[in-house]
């Protein structure tokens, strides 16, 4: 996994991969779209959205 732009279904798939059974809290208000789609995010940043 390298830092990359993740948008739409790619972002959701990446969250499933990173969070696994923990699941994740997804809401556009949390800024994940700005952080990972508009900008580039890392695996570490994605983990912040796991439950």
Curated annotation (Swiss-Prot):
Pfam family, one: Insulin
PROSITE patterns xrefs: INSULIN (PS00262)
Disulfide bonds, paired cysteine numbers: 7-37, 19-50, 36-41
Keyword Secreted among record annotations: yes
Secreted listed as a keyword: yes
Coiled coil: none
GO BP terms: cellular response to oxygen-containing compound; glucose homeostasis; glucose metabolic process; positive regulation of protein secretion
Gene Ontology MF: a single term: hormone activity
Compartments where found: Secreted
Cellular component terms (Gene Ontology): extracellular space
Keyword set, alphabetical order: Carbohydrate metabolism, Disulfide bond, Glucose metabolism, Hormone, Secreted
Leader peptide range in chain numbering: none
Assembly, per entry: Heterodimer of a B chain and an A chain linked by two disulfide bonds.
Function: Insulin decreases blood glucose concentration. It increases cell permeability to monosaccharides, amino acids and fatty acids. It accelerates glycolysis, the pentose phosphate cycle, and glycogen synthesis in liver.
Family from the record: Belongs to the insulin family.
Protein name per its UniProtKB record: Insulin
Native source organism of the sequence: Balaenoptera physalus (Fin whale)
